[in-house]
Structures are given as C-alpha cells and as structure tokens.
UniProtKB/Swiss-Prot annotation:
Residues 938-1077 are annotated as: Allosteric domain. Large subunit of the glutamine-dependent carbamoyl phosphate synthetase (CPSase). CPSase catalyzes the formation of carbamoyl phosphate from the ammonia moiety of glutamine, carbonate, and phosphate donated by ATP, constituting the first step of 2 biosynthetic pathways, one leading to arginine and/or urea and the other to pyrimidine nucleotides. This is Carbamoyl phosphate synthase large chain. Its cofactor is Mg(2+); Mn(2+). It comes from Buchnera aphidicola subsp. Schizaphis graminum (strain Sg). NCBIfam families: CPSaseII_lrg, PRK05294.1, PRK12815.1. The keyword Ligase applies.
C-alpha cells in the first residue's frame, strides 16, 4: 500500500533537553523522522526546546518551534498550524507523556489530530504497569511477581507479597528515574516516597528481585500488514539490577541458545501485536534466570529508544526512518534498504558478521559525595560503541574509545598489598561501580577463577572466559617483551583488540616505538563494511570499522578533495551534543561544496554517526592509532579537529608531528591560546586586561602567588574542558585541600591561579575570523555572575543589561585577539565585566558549546560558515560580514542532574555539571527567560511563601529583591542575618531557624510544603553546610531555588510573563533579523 493521502501535515514532538536517561539518541531519531517524512512531501511541524539538536535546524521542518514541550504550548501550536497527525514516538518519554496529556484533555479530538506511530491505547498498555501485566497474561508470558501502588500504604501491602530485596519503578518515567532496589523497610519507604512524587500518574510498580538474572533486549519493527522483523538482539553483559543504560551491552546476543532466541523472538512479535503497536519500532526487554532458564518479560517501549539508536548503528538498519515511513502507511516490503539499494527491502532482517560492544560513560567525579554504585536508576551520561570481529576485539576497542585515559584492561589496584587488593577487588565485583570491568581483569591477575568472579558478579561465564584470556595474553606479552613481537604474535594480539598504546605499556616502550615496529612489519588493519547482510550483497554505502584480516573493503575513492572531520567521542559533561552538531554541519557544508566528507566517531547516539551524513563513515575510537590508519588509507587534503571538543584537539600536536595537514586554525595558534604564558604576552601586547593570574607546579608556589593575587582565587588545571577540577578558593587551607585532591587524582599538568572577580558579569562571544575580517556571531550575557561555569549559567542574546559602549569595546577586543592568534575559523572568547572594566577570562580558538544556540538565535549557521573559511572561502565571498542583532531575545538555560544524585552539593560553581540545555525565545528578556525556565522543568509558582537566606555580600541586593517579591504577593521568610538586613530597610520577614538552630527549622517547613521559592547564596565556609542542606531539600520537595542573586532577579523578571501565551516558529523569527555594520 502507498503512503497515506489523508494526511498533509505532521506534528513531531522532540525529547527536549539532554538529561540522564534521555540523551541525543532522540535527536538522531527525530532528525531521521523529519527527513524521511519531508521527502515524502508532508508538511513537518516540529516542537523541541533543545537548540543543540540537528532536528531543530530550520531546514529540517517547515515550521520549527523551539518551545517548551508542554501541553499548553503544543495546544497553541496545534491551533495555529492545524496538523493532521501527531507523531509522538520519536521524542522519548517526554513526547509520549505530552501526547497522553493532550489526549486526556481532549485537545487531539477537538482539533481532529490523529496520532500515528502508536495509538493512545498502545502507549497506555505498554506504560501502565497493571495493563501491561494483564496483556502478558493473555499471551501466557511470565512477568515478575509484582504489585501496583499509588501511595505508601498500598506499597507496604505489595511488599508483604513481594518481599526483600525488591525493585521499585515509577510509571511513565525514563532512565529508571526515581526507582531503586530496596533491601530494608527504611530504603523501601524512602524510594517509594520519591518515586510517587516523580511518577506523573503517582503510580509505582514493585517487583520481586531479579538481581543476577541475565538481561536481553529485542528491537522489533512492525508494519500495518502485521509483518514483523527483529532488527537486532542485544545482550546485557551486566545482569539484572543494573539499569540497561548503565550496562555494557553486546549485539548480537552471545549466550542465548537458538531455542531461547526463537522463543524470545516469537514472544517479542506477539507482544507488539497484543499491545497494539500497529506500526514502527519497539524495544522489548527480557530476563532469564541462569539457574533454571525461567524467562520473564520485563517491559517494552512502544517507541524508538536508546537501544533503537544502538541497534540502528550496530546493523545499519535505520529504525527511526523506517518507523516514520511505516507510520504514514508504507509496509516493510515497500521500503528499500538504503545500504544495499535495490538488492533488498526493509522486510529483510539484518544479518551481521561482527560483534558490537557498547560501554556507558560516567561522570561521577563531577558529583562528589554521590552514590556511585550502579542500580536500577540510570547514572551514565554517555556511551561509546565499538565494532570488531570478536568480542575481545570489540570490547578492547570500546574501552579505548571511552576517553578516560584507558588503553585496555588497565589495572585498578597497585598489587603492593595483595590482601587489601583482593578485598578491594571483591567489593568492586560484588557492588558494581563504573569501573567493574577493569576490576574483573584485576581479579584474574590476582588468581581468582572464572567461577569465583561469576559468584560475585553474576556475569555469564562465557564473557568472563573471554576477559580471562585477554589477561593471560597480557602476561604473555610482558614475558615476551618488545623483542618477542614478531609478525605472527603481533598480528595475533592485534586481532584480539590490543591497542598500540596497551602493548607499549605492557612492553615498557613508547607508543611511537610500537607503531614504528608495526609499520616495519607491514601490519595494518583492514576495513569492513556495515551492510545489514553479512556481505551477501554489494553496497555503495561506506560505513566501516577496522579489524585485522586479509581483505580490505574500504575502497577509498580517488577524489583529491577529501577532508576528514573528527568527532567528539562519547558524551560527557563539558563535551556533549553541541560539538556533534558542529561536526554534522561541517560534513554538510563540505558535501554541499563538492568535497568528500569523511567522519570518524564512536558515539552511537549521535547524528554524526548516521551513515548518510558523510560520504564515508569510520566508526572507530578517536585515538592517534586509529586516525593515522584512516589518514594512511584515505590520503585526505586535511583534517578538521576544532569541532569535536577536546577529544581531537588534544591530538593536534601529534597530528602535526606526523605531517597530517590540519584545516583551519593551526596547532600553534591553539597552543598560544591555551598556554598561559604565551597568551599573557599577547594580551599585554594588545594592551588588554586580564584578571591577575599565575601558573604554578607546586603547592609552595601556589601559596606565594595566591598572596600576590589576593584571595579569593580561581584554581584549575590547564587544558581541561567543562571546568573540570575547577574551584574557587577563599583561604590558604582551601588551597592545601585542593592540591591534596589534585595530586591524589594523579594530575600532572600545571595549575592555573586566577583572581576571582566577585560580582562581575560574564560574557561569551562566538566569532569567526578568516584572517582579514571577523564576524561576531553573538554576544551573550550570562545571568549568573562570574564564578558559575559558563556551561551551567543561563545566558541571553542579545545582552540584557550591558551598555552599547561596553558591547562595542568587546567587539573590538575580540577582533584584536582573533588577528593576534591567527585564528582561521571559529573562536569563543569569555569576558568578565566589573565596574565597566573588561577582563579577558579565556579564548578558545575552536567551536564552543554555544555555537548551536547562537546559530538558532541569529539565523547564521556559524559552523558551516566557519568550515568554509577554514578551507579558504573568505567571509566576504560567502556574504557574511555583518553581525546579526535579533529583534527578539533568546535565553539558553542549563539543565542539571542533581535529582539523580542525592546527597550531592547542588550549589553552582566553576566546575560544569549540567547535562543539557533549553532555549526560550520571547519578545523581551523576561518572556524568553520564563520559557527557558518552563522548558527546563523549573517548578516556579507565582505566589506563596519565599525563603531568603543570603551571604553578607548579598544583603544589600536582597532588599530590592524582597520588595519585588512582595509586589507579586509573596510572603517572606528569612534566616537570622538576612532577616536583620531586611528589617533595617523596613521589610518584615518571618524568622526561620537553620537546621542547627532548633525546630521548626527550614527542612521542617519545606517538608510541610510551606515554600514555593528559595533564594540561598553562600561563600567560603559561611553556612556552606546549611546551604547545601537547604538546596538538597528544595530539590527533594520540588521547590525552585536560586543560588545567585542575579539568578533570583532574572527569576522575578520572568514572573511578569506567561510562558505559554505566545508562540513563534524559528522560520518566522529569522525573517525579523536586523543587520548592523
């Protein structure tokens, strides 16, 4: 059957900001859906609040709304655009929940909007735990012994039947949010209480414990004619009890018998039919008891998911694209397989002759004091995928791609004290953390058996034997040494996945020496293609991975206009989707201009690793070894390293040494900006200002320089991204503590000390330089004052308080710096403004995380303009010489994951901790900020009682804030010091006790629901513990809080606006742009 003709326009719901449990895999799926449906001639209307996504590029839809995904706003968009259909299956749990709310309120029926991709009944049957259990009973499929609860009393009744330990899962949440494993009554009540608050339907599923069972997933696609295919089977290496998003996963499943696989396959298809998923992709999860083979169904997602993205990249089968086309009436046999072309259709199940391994990436070091043990609530912030012919090759490649400084199965213990080492290893195996896979290696080094490790981990012995063999091989490499690396042995260990760097460490040599020997032996990898059919049919799509065999399928073209774009690797805090956005734009611009674009990346969640974004895709870890091999075979004109964040940048000098041409700003210019002494000379020569600063290597030097600069000071290591290990130090003892931590973590780079400019306004500027002219992309004013990391601070474009005079001075300084640093391409400059003086904080001659936001706010595709500059097309030739000053305001707001990490200090500081961002667009700053707050799920009420508790430095400012709050009708509470300051100005506030001052105290009042807003600022050690406790409690009870006075004033300004009142598409606002000379 052909596509549906009764539908002319389709509204697609995005997933909103990147959060733990819902990351950029939904940009990948949403972008695929937009492209697929647009090429079919449908009018596409898109709603998504995340500006860092490819799907929100104006070219992807006919009407793009960067608006909060809230039912009131979506209702207004439906009223305005009159879509015929709504596609909610591409935006994760956020989109599904919004669709359900629109249906519940009768909005879809009122405006005659048809849901496609999944019916409301199907969503409810899959998401509602009771309905799902009933559906499984109809199919005679077992589910875990469980019960449903809507309050604590019901939960306790369920507990009597289920017993301890038990697993608690809130309904309609993502990433296991709010859930957990309870081993006792206290834990049970605590998790249930939290879960009930987080479930939109106030519903919990309480399961019997399946800890230690094996976990599997099936990616299923079904069409309207009841044709079903299994795209991919996925096996979790980690057993049940660890969220699948935090598990190492393998595709295809390795330890299922054929009989088990067929039972699971048939069950998956039956589940889709029973639930009512008429078209599209779904993910079905199973558990098998390894002791008796009992199989149960865990859950299913009636939408594309994190696993769908992994399965798509693992097989080459574009699940989201196919699901979108099935949603409008096509059947699987009518859709061509893009990779094999006319040879096969989408009804052919993919067949793969390789092993794919996904390893999650964690950022626990950003959240000191958090529980870093892995449970049923997801905690990872990204992931890496690797492809090899064997599991051993695949997992070792994946480890190298993690960007954590690991070359393979590095040891985590010193082996200096064998007894203590074994105690540590046993603990890490039993109570899994982010590094368990390395401790398994150490367990085998200590002489533990496969059975010993299995008893502690419940990981299938097949995987353990594979890892044990790798450790045995390591011992053999050490025994043979460098001189024992003959051709046969070298080739053998490369086939097992050993990197040059790992071999170098084991033989006590430099990586360069190992590489040189390998070259002398003429040992190089070959490249195989991902083709969906195990090489049964030929393919023109160059989607490749490296392995160690005889035949190479890379077949590089003879095109002399080749440029390699190096991606950013796995998402982590400080380096996220924004850099992938830039890489995608680079590939698009190159292809538009007749270049052959070659992408290297290893992140399965991203758009850049879609096989049709570049001409050639190498799915490889971003290491020197891998890039050199690809350069050797492709012989490109050059490589682009400025778009993938710190990952490719740190290889710049080595690329230069190896003679690889770098497109754009050269490594020396990058070093000039990064090297403190070199940069200071440039600033001095240009007669510009910097905060007083110094570079030190020892604690003694640091104390001496700190006295010269004057406390407080900002302390950080050189060459880091995301403010890693950055702190504000107020006194000498803080400096001592910082160095203790720093040395403990084995940092060896120089330490940078900067004067901390208290109450300064921070400013970000994105610009492009072609060597002759500088294009100012945008001047962004931060809402939180300097001292809060730029990635965690909200910002406004255009600036909302800076004078034109200051902004013009900033423009001039950016231009001077661009020319002095010989920038060719993008650059980002950060300033601090204090008492009308401009101080340069830092310059980054590369793409910054603000590029997507500025591009959406101004209509200028900065990454594309810059890439063309980098390969020689001037700004004048492109027609971009004028800065764009929008007539509307755009605000970028950070989204923080503190609700996932209980017990963590939630006060913002110089180290970045946000996982994502949203954008609000409005006629003025207030409206834009109110939308950004709504998009980031800020629960800000417009009335009630406010708690004010601020540091001494803020007491003058707080009076004005209190006056404004009273005008809105808020009642004021204040702690003792703040109350005195308010009283002096004639403002009466109810005095409230801090926790240590007696009851009723702040926590009591929060628990009683007395507060709707909290302003709490602190400095040094003054009230630090109190402040942390206040903010943690505010998070727990869903009360909005600000930890800076500037942030509080912006919040009050936003109260003047109704964020759901006005909507406008990106296409409409870009027509209103004004240009200035």
């Amino acid at each position: 059957m052909p596509k549906s003709t009764d539908i002319k326009s389709i509204l697609i719901l995005g997933a909103g900001p990147i959060v733990i449990g819902q990351a950029c895999e939904f940009d990948y799926s949403g972008a695929q859906a937009c492209k697929a449906l647009k090429e079919e001639g449908y009018k596409i209307i898109l709603v998504n609040s995340n500006p860092a996504t490819i799907m929100t590029d104006p070219c992807m839809a006919d009407a793009t709304y960067i608006e909060p995904i809230h039912w009131k706003i979506v209702k207004k968009i439906i009223q305005k655009e009159q879509p015929d259909a709504l596609l909610p299956t591409m935006g994760g749990q956020t989109a599904l929940n919004c669709a359900l709310e629109l249906n519940r309120r009768g909005i879809l029926k009122k405006f005659n909007v048809k849901i496609i991709g999944a019916t409301i009944d199907a969503i409810n049957k899959a998401e509602d735990r009771k309905l799902f259990e009933d559906s499984m009973k109809k199919l005679n499929l077992k589910t875990a012994k469980c019960g449903i609860a809507h309050n604590i009393q019901e939960a306790l009744l369920v507990l009597k039947n289920v017993g301890f330990p038990c697993i608690i899962r809130p309904s309609f949440t993502m990433g296991g949010h709010g859930g957990g494993i309870a081993y006792n009554q206290e834990e049970f009540e605590d998790i249930c209480e939290r879960g009930l608050k987080l479930s939109p339907t106030t519903e919990l599923l309480i399961d019997e414990s399946l800890i230690g069972w094996k976990e599997y997933e099936m990616e299923v696609v079904r069409d309207k004619n009841n044709n079903c295919i299994i795209v991919c089977s996925i096996e979790n290496l980690d057993p049940m009890g660890i969220h699948t998003g935090d598990s190492i996963t393998i595709a295809p499943a390795q330890t299922l018998s054929d009989k088990e696989y067929q039972i699971m396959r048939n069950a998956s298809m039956s589940i889709l039919r029973e639930i009512g998923v008429e078209t599209g992709g779904s993910n079905v999860q199973f558990a098998i008891n390894p002791k008796n083979g009992r199989m149960i169904v865990i859950e299913m997602n009636p939408r594309v998911s994190r696993s769908s993205a992994l399965a798509s990249k693992a097989t080459g089968f574009p699940i989201a694209k196919i699901a979108a086309k099935l949603a409008v009436g096509y059947t699987l046999d009518e859709l061509a397989n893009d990779i094999t072309g006319i040879n096969t259709t989408a009804s052919f199940e993919p067949s793969i002759d390789y092993i794919v391994t996904k390893i999650p990436r964690f950022n626990f070091e950003k959240f000191l004091g958090c529980n870093d043990r892995l449970t049923t609530q997801m905690k990872s912030v990204g992931e890496v995928m690797a492809i090899g012919r064997t599991f051993q090759e695949s997992i070792q490649k994946a480890i190298c791609g993690l960007e954590i400084g690991s070359s393979g199965f590095d040891s985590k213990v010193s082996f200096a004290d064998n007894k203590q080492d074994i105690i540590k290893i046993r603990h890490e195996l039993k109570d899994a953390g982010a590094e368990r896979i390395w401790y398994i290696g150490d367990a085998f080094r200590c002489g533990m058996s496969v059975n010993d490790v299995f008893e502690l981990t419940s990981i299938d012995p097949w995987f353990l034997v594979q890892i044990q063999e790798i450790i045995q091989l390591e011992k053999k490499i050490i025994q043979k040494g460098f001189i024992g690396l003959d051709y046969n042995f070298f080739y053998f260990i490369k086939r097992k996945g050993f990197s040059d760097l790992r071999i170098a460490i084991l033989t006590n040599k430099k990586e360069e020496e190992i590489r040189q020997l390998r070259y002398e032996l003429n040992l190089h990898p070959v490249y195989k293609r991902i083709d969906t059919c195990s090489a049964e049919f030929s393919t023109e799509t160059a989607y490749m991975y490296s392995t160690w065999e005889d035949e190479c399928e890379s077949h590089p073209t003879k095109n002399t206009k080749k440029i390699i774009v190096i991606g950013g690797g796995p998402n982590r805090i400080g380096q996220g989707i924004e850099f992938d956005y830039c890489c995608v734009h680079a590939a698009q611009a190159l292809r538009e201009d007749g270049f052959e674009a070659i992408m290297i990346n290893c992140n399965p969640e991203t758009v850049s690793t879609d096989y049709d974004i570049s001409d050639r895709l190498y799915f490889e870890p971003i290491t020197l070894e891998n890039v050199l091999e690809i350069v050797r075979i492709e012989n490109p004109k050059g490589v682009i390293i400025q778009y993938g964040g710190q990952t490719p940048l740190k290889l710049a000098r080595q690329f230069e040494k190896e003679g690889i041409p770098i497109i754009g700003t050269n490594p020396d210019a990058i070093d000039k900006a990064e090297d403190r002494n070199r940069f200071q000379k440039i600033v001095t020569k240009l007669k510009l200002k910097q905060p007083l600063n110094a570079t030190v290597l020892t604690l003694e030097e640091a104390h001496k320089k700190a006295i010269e600069i004057g406390y407080p000071i900002m302390v950080r290591p050189s060459y880091v991204l995301g403010g890693r290990a950055m702190e504000i130090v107020y006194e000498p003892c803080d400096l001592d503590n910082y160095f203790k931590k720093f040395l403990k973590n084995n940092h060896i780079t120089p330490i940078l000390l900067d004067q901390y400019l208290n109450y300064a306004i921070e400013v970000d500027v994105d610009a492009i330089c072609d060597g002759e002219k500088v294009l100012i992309g945008g001047i962004m004013e931060h809402i939180e004052q300097a001292g809060v990391h730029s990635g965690d601070s909200a910002c406004s474009l255009p600036a909302y308080t800076l004078t034109n005079k200051i902004q013009n001075k900033i423009r001039e300084q950016v231009k001077k710096l661009a020319f002095a640093l010989s920038v060719k391409g993008l650059m980002n400059v950060q300033f601090a403004i204090k008492n009308n003086e401009i101080y340069i904080i830092e310059v980054n001659p590369r793409a910054a995380r603000t590029v997507p936001f500025v591009s959406k706010a101004t209509g200028l595709a900065l990454a594309k303009i810059s890439v063309r500059v980098m390969y020689g097309k001037t700004l004048s030739e492109q027609g971009f010489c004028k800065e764009v000053i929008p007539s509307y305001f755009s605000v970028k707001e950070a989204v923080l994951p503190f609700d996932k990490f209980q017990g963590v200090d939630p006060i913002l500081g110089p180290e970045m901790r946000s996982t994502g961002e949203v954008m609000g667009i409005g006629k003025n700053f207030s409206e834009a900020f109110s939308k950004a707050m709504l998009g980031s799920h800020t629960n800000m009420k417009k009335s009630g009682r406010v708690l004010l508790s601020v540091r001494d430095d803020d007491k003058n400012s707080i009076v004005n804030l209190a006056v404004k709050l009273q005008k809105f009708g808020f009642k004021i509470d204040a702690t003792k010091g703040t109350s005195i300051a308010l009283k002096k100005s004639g403002i009466m506030a109810r005095l409230v006790n801090k926790v240590h001052e007696g009851r009723p105290h702040i926590q009591d009042r929060l628990k009683n629901g007395e507060y709707s807003y909290i302003v709490n600022t602190t400095s040094c050690h003054q009230g630090m513990k109190d402040s942390q406790l206040i903010c943690r409690s505010a998070l727990q009870y869903k009360v909005h809080y600000d930890t800076t006075v500037n942030g509080a004033f912006a919040t009050v300004m936003a109260l003047n606006e109704e964020p759901t009142e006005n909507i406008i598409s990106l296409q409409e606002i870009h027509k209103k742009i004004n240009l200035i000379n």
